[in-house]
Regions:
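Short loop/turn segments that flank or connect secondary-structure elements
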Residues: 1-174
């Protein structure tokens, strides 16, 4: 969805969005039940994930019984708050191994987020993407306002679990 702004090679080399510190576990992507079920069993990727309902207390008020999150918190090896744990489906050489039909929507639109800001849905930029930076440039704004934003809003209507609570410092694009 963002290929005109971010190349697959750039993202595969960076991998920032695919690893999580303890304080960023709220950012772990959510999977629809049918995808989580497929990925927790032997599958075409040769990697299985451990999933839990998103409503198990690890997320905000917009969670849904119809979403699952990867369980990553048991993968930390130290007590260091800066330690990062990669997504189960991240290959160190190739990047994400999931095909588009299995990739969470959150991942497809990152570093964009749909957020609830005071009861209004907004499209915001995650300010920590090393390739985009903390301020949206004209190309990104044009992409969002030129149709991608509406696609994200439409997806959120049928998948409300992708909506996150707004956090200060996330520039609103739309």
């Amino acid at each position: 969805m963002l290929s005109s702004i971010l190349s697959k090679n750039t993202c595969a080399a960076c991998k920032f969005c695919c690893s999580f510190r303890r304080q960023s576990l709220w950012e772990t992507p959510l999977f629809p039940p049918e995808i989580a079920e497929k990925l927790q069993k032997t599958n075409k990727y040769g990697v299985t994930g451990k999933f839990a309902p998103a409503s198990d207390g690890a997320r905000d008020a917009h969670e849904s019984q119809n979403a699952y999150r990867l369980v990553l918190e048991n993968n930390y090896r130290t007590d260091d708050p800066e330690e990062e744990v990669p997504c189960t489906f991240l290959d160190p050489e190739r990047g994400c191994i999931l095909k588009p039909e299995d990739k969470p929507f959150d991942c497809s639109i990152w570093p964009l987020r749909i957020m609830d800001k005071g009861g209004k849905l907004v499209i915001a930029l995650t300010p920590t993407c090393p390739s985009i930076g903390a301020t949206p440039d004209k190309a990104l704004v044009d992409l969002v306002q030129g149709g991608l934003g509406e696609q994200i809003f439409e997806y959120a209507k049928t998948h409300p679990y992708i909506v996150k609570e707004y956090r200060e410092g996330f520039p609103v694009i739309m």
